[in-house]
Amino acid sequence: MDILKKSLFLVLFLGLVSLSICEEEKRENEDEEKQEDDEQSEMKRALWKTMLKKLGTMALHAGKAALGAAADTISQGTQ
C-alpha cells in the first residue's frame, strides 16, 4: 500500500510539473505573438504616417500650382 501511495504521488507530481511547463510555454508563445502584433502595428502606423506626409506634400504642391495657374490666368485677362 505504501508503494502504491508513493507511485500515485510521483505520477501526480510529474503530471503537475509537465502541466506547469506546458502553461509556461503557452504564455511565452502568447507573449511572442503579442510582441509580433505590436511590431506589425508599429510598422503599419509608420507606413500610414509616411503616406499621409507624402500626400500632404503633394496636395500642397498641387494647391500652389493651381493658385499660380489661376494668378497667371487673371493677370493675362487684365492685360
Swiss-Prot record:
Leader sequence residues: 1-22
Annotated propeptide span(s): 23-45
Localization in the cell: Secreted
Pfam families from the UniProt entry: DD_K, FSAP_sig_propep
InterPro entries hit by this protein: Dermaseptin_dom, Frog_antimicrobial_propeptide, FSAP
Tissue: Expressed by the skin glands.
Superkingdom of origin organism: Eukaryota
Any one GO CC term of the record: extracellular region
Gene Ontology biological process: defense response to bacterium; defense response to fungus; innate immune response; killing of cells of another organism; regulation of defense response to virus
First-listed, main subcellular location of the protein, grouped into a coarse class: secreted
Keywords: Amphibian defense peptide, Antibiotic, Antimicrobial, Antiviral protein, Fungicide, Immunity, Innate immunity, Secreted, Signal
Function text: Antimicrobial activity with potent activity against Gram-positive and Gram-negative bacteria, fungi and protozoa. Also stimulates the microbicidal activity of polymorphonuclear leukocytes. Probably acts by disturbing membrane functions with its amphipathic structure. Does not show cytotoxicity on lymphocytes or KB cells. Does not show hemolytic activity. In vitro, shows spermicidal, antiviral, and anti-leishmanial activities.
Family to which the UniProt record says this protein belongs: Belongs to the frog skin active peptide (FSAP) family. Dermaseptin subfamily.
Protein name: Dermaseptin-S1
Source species of the chain: Phyllomedusa sauvagei (Sauvage's leaf frog)
